[in-house]
Amino acid sequence: MRLIVMGQQAFGKSALEAILEKGEDEVVAVYCAPDKEGKPVDPIKTFAEEKGLPVYQPDNFKDAEYLDAMRALNADLCVMAYVIIFVPEEARDIPTHGSICFHPSILPKHRGPSSINWPIIGGATKSGLTFFWPDDGLDEGEILLQKHIDITPDDTLGTVYFEKIFPLGIEATLEAIALVKAGNPPRIVQDSSLATYESWCRKADAEIDWFKSSADVYNLIRGTNPQPGSWTTHDGNELKVFDCAKVEASGKPGEVVAVSDEGITVATKDGGILVKRVKPHDGKKITSADYISKVSLTAGVVFG
């Protein structure tokens, strides 16, 4: 088939690379977001240009010139590999078989742009990914295929994405294309009664509330590690918190009840969190032991 690959960042680049390596389909063009001044060039653009592929970077898909250029490609399918901008029906339906889109959750659960963060924050033990046929709703189109993963108690946003969803998503990209090529691909209507939606997981969402349970605090820290990064305050300054563990402790919520080479033990509503790695407001990520030494931290200090 003649494919348009639409995507961005590392996942889009790796999906394009996998399609080219398989060598069964012709990539006729690559679409990615416009360049931003002062920002690195998107890796999918760099890779596509290295391979001699046409690259398009429309700021919208409504202008007639962009739509005409897409029609001229005579594509059979558009593969949307990590796309966070809205692509209207007029553009989606230009390829003979339309467009398929990757989403990192088991739809209809966790529609929205931060669909890996929120399941971890909520304490979920399973998640996955979906390829679906996008419509004008947000992640509401018919389902083509789904793949499931386990979320372990030690998983973070980083491990779930880079070690599980990312590689499985690349495999699923090739499988999704093959399903369309084979004819009569699945189109399973999402059960809207099961749908959930969450917006971006932003800095405000990542502030630690030490008055919550140890489980809730622990899940927030790992569900925002590395981005956007959970945080608290110390002496009025922001302190980001990364690697941690649940421990037994007693004290008022937010109180530093112990400091050691292992880290900083902070009391919660029903126990404690051993903070192992932090990022001060004026520096890089460091071990908690280094932070203890840097600021002469002692038990009795209250975070937050």
Give residue ranges: language-model regions:
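One-carbon transfer enzymes
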Residues: M1-P226, A258-S260, G271-L274, P280, ...
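Short, intrinsically disordered/low-complexity patches at protein termini
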Residues: T125, E163, T232, K240-D243, ...
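Short acidic-hydrophobic surface loop/beta-edge motif
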Residues: I208, S230-H234, I264-T268
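Short, solvent-exposed recognition patches
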Residues: W210, H234-G251
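A sequence-level detector of short linear motifs
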Residues: K240, L274-V275
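Low-complexity, glycine/alanine/valine/leucine- and proline-rich hydrophobic stretches
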Residues: A245-I273, D282
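A short, acidic, flexible beta-alpha connecting loop/helix-capping segment that sits on the rim
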Residues: K279-G283, L297-T298
